[in-house]
Amino acid sequence: VAIRIIWSDIQD
């Protein structure tokens, strides 16, 4: 699961 990776990409 890469929810944190995706979320981080969106937050940036």
Swiss-Prot record:
Q: Which UniProt keywords apply?
A: Secreted
> Where in the body, by tissue, does this protein show up?
Expressed by the venom gland.
| Keyword presence, Mitochondrion | no
Q: Which domain of life is it from?
A: Eukaryota
Q: Where in the cell is it found?
A: Secreted
Task: State the disulfide connectivity.
Answer: none
The leader peptide range reads none
The name this protein carries in UniProt is Venom peptide 7
Organism name: Brotheas amazonicus
Gene Ontology CC terms:
extracellular region
